[in-house]
Amino acid sequence: MNIALKRINYLINISRVSDNPERCIDLMEKISKRMDITLNHDIKLQYCKVCKMPYRNPVIRLKNGFVLIHCDHCGNTRRIKIRDHSVSSSK
């Protein structure tokens, strides 16, 4: 399992400079499915789910409690809900 995590981290890093980043991200997802590993949330936010390309210069906006990430390659918009971390203080 440790080898699989190292391989996933290597693939996400190499996808930023690779000539074929779709292949790197596809391999990363296949390894995580085969080994039953949930990808880290930070890793999932580094690439577009539709075109499997790492974000190069995404347009990021905040709107109505969501973070909108617009992919510069395929034009897909990803919506991520902003978590409310306010905890009521004890009285």
Swiss-Prot record:
The keyword Endoplasmic reticulum does not apply. Keywords: Cytoplasm, Endonuclease, Hydrolase, Metal-binding, Nuclease, tRNA processing, Zinc. The keyword Lipid metabolism does not apply. Zn(2+) binds at C48, C51, C71, C74. It is found in: Cytoplasm. It comes from the Archaea. It catalyses: Endonucleolytic cleavage of RNA, removing 5'-extranucleotides from tRNA precursor. This is Ribonuclease P protein component 4. It comes from Picrophilus torridus (strain ATCC 700027 / DSM 9790 / JCM 10055 / NBRC 100828 / KAW 2/3). The gene is rnp4.
